Design a protein with these regions (language model features):
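Single-stranded RNA-binding regions, centering on S1/OB-family and related RNA-binding modules
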Residues: 1-267
Length: 267
């Protein structure tokens, strides 16, 4: 079951021009809204175009709830990275020029309360991949809140780079692995949602030949690990000339459910 109080920014990609009446009602109700940042100015304020010649501004101090310095301001690169991206915000005020003053920080504060009070280990959340590092993936799960997905939690089959499975902007479901509420740190896992060993193994039968991907070549252990699915790996005898990432055909020699093992032969 997906548990979500806040959609990730940009989960729903759409734009509908907004009227002043609509924005004023949203301001009164404290509604969380979404728009695309059209510009980051020289003071690192973010500008939103609502259509109908109506604009809004997210002042720099209202951009972030977490990633700020000792003065309460986010770093310039954080502000600049929001250009042409969907962001969530609340309408705080309207100035004498009819420009709406917005706050992304207020949404972030609400999302932090959700994380601290309601989000639990094992819950499934929607997320969007925001950045990829060699060690893992940063995923936004709602209201600007970001969790870390370590590379070893992406799949059972070992991979050398997260980009072999996920890409920036990809939308998917993730499971909460752990929460450090004191430091606002969330660890996610993806492999638990790719099926158990039994669920994956039932799609294969002894005596059949299928395609696999080489994931580990360990000559010392006299074996090559072959990915049949992201969450199902079999072991084949070592063979010269086989390299990581290579597509190979494998004969399924034996499936051993009680040991959760699959014996393969590279053909």
């Amino acid at each position: 079951m997906i548990y979500q109080r806040f959609n990730p920014e940009g989960w729903e990609e759409n734009f509908t021009p907004m009227s002043k009446d609509y924005l004023n009602k949203a301001m009164e109700a404290g509604t969380i809204m979404q728009g695309v940042v059209r510009k980051c100015d020289s003071n690192y304020n973010l500008h939103i175009d609502f259509g109908n010649n109506i604009t809004g501004i997210i002042p720099r101090e209202e951009v972030e709830a977490i990633n700020v310095d000792e003065t309460g301001f986010p770093k310039p690169n954080i502000c600049m990275s929001k250009v042409n991206q969907y962001v969530q915000f609340k309408v705080k005020d309207v100035d004498e020029r009819d420009k709406y003053i917005l706050s992304r920080k207020d949404v972030g504060k609400e999302a932090l309360k959700w994380v601290k009070n309601e989000l639990e280990k094992g819950q499934i959340v929607k997320g969007i991949v925001k950045s990829i590092r060699p060690y893992g993936v940063f995923v936004e799960i709602g209201g600007g809140i970001v969790g870390l997905l370590h590379i070893e939690d992406i799949s059972v089959a070992r991979i050398k780079s997260p980009q072999e499975r996920l890409k920036i902007g990809q939308k998917a479901n993730f499971m909460v692995k752990s929460i450090d509420r004191g430091n606002n740190r969330i660890l996610l896992t993806y492999k638990e949602l790719l099926g158990t060993w039994e669920e994956n193994a039932k799609n294969f039968e002894e005596g059949s030949t299928v395609k696999g991907i080489v994931r580990e070549t360990e000559k010392a252990k006299n074996g090559i690990f072959i990915e049949l699915t992201p969450n199902l790996v079999g072991l084949a005898e070592y063979k010269e000339g086989i390299e990581y990432g290579q597509n190979v055909n494998v004969y399924i020699k034996k499936i051993i459910p009680e040991k959760k093992k699959v014996k393969l032969v590279i053909v």
